[in-house]
């Protein structure tokens, strides 16, 4: 009874703690925070205490532009915690930001979405980070399950649903039926690998060095996973490695398609393996109803077309794919209240 009473007054949070972005969904309010998973840490002298200089958008602006005493860090790598201290500081900052007036409210229950490939140690680190950031109770849910719920798939029915969640650090492929994950796999390929591939292509073919932010802009503006009818172009500047000075050059969408071949092949093969290993009845459900793409990577132009051509199965990009996992986590919190926490692990 007391738990229920406290739950009425605290803002329950669903957190999609991503490699690229952190999203927070609050019950009854929707997505209230969508910020880059970046923290700027200041340390004035060796051995002096570290302090947080900026978090989120402000810190992302600093990537590659910081003086010696400030380091802009991305504490999540491949979907899991790479820097425990910085992740906890980032979560504290974000939870404080959305859980205002906490003087009157009890600390929130927090549901965190974790990659299917996360080990027990990595899950415990995520759980302890959330507790250290002020959570009263922590639930963990696997990302593909949250993505499927957020995309509106019938996860509780005796029918196979396939979700491909392409985040910043990982791509999670899962087949879901009767509130359970029947098959899941995680490959460490995502939006970051796309950016890396573009940086490497430019270095190899233009002898120029570009930063992460420029690579991301190229990906968003002219990136494509399948040859299109029109060829788009973009003007960029990078540091010429031979001359050591900035130089401008033009890239087109066909070049970026070529640059992205390796990571795209990895995603396609992960999907093919999932289809091969799926039980026959569920495979027939999927071939009839298709698969759903979620996550920021699903926004890459023509990715649905590529997967459709390679698998021969209908592919749909979820509505607002970037927020699917966080929204699904929010719905899952409501399911906890109705059915108890059997969908989720508290450890």
UniProtKB/Swiss-Prot annotation:
ATP binds at residues 19-21, 168-170, 216-219, 296-299. Its main location: cytoplasm. The keyword Nucleus does not apply. GO terms for molecular function: ATP binding; identical protein binding. Disruption phenotype: Depletion results in enlarged, spherical cells. Requires ATP hydrolysis for polymerization. Polymerization is inhibited by toxins CbtA and CptA, as well as by A22 ([S-(3,4-dichlorobenzyl)isothiourea)] all of which cause cell rounding and eventual death. Inhibition by toxin CbtA is neutralized by cytoskeleton bundling-enhancing protein CbeA, inhibition by toxin CptA is neutralized by antitoxin CptB, while inhibition by A22 can be neutralized by overexpression of CbeA. This is Cell shape-determining protein MreB. It comes from Escherichia coli (strain K12). The gene is mreB.
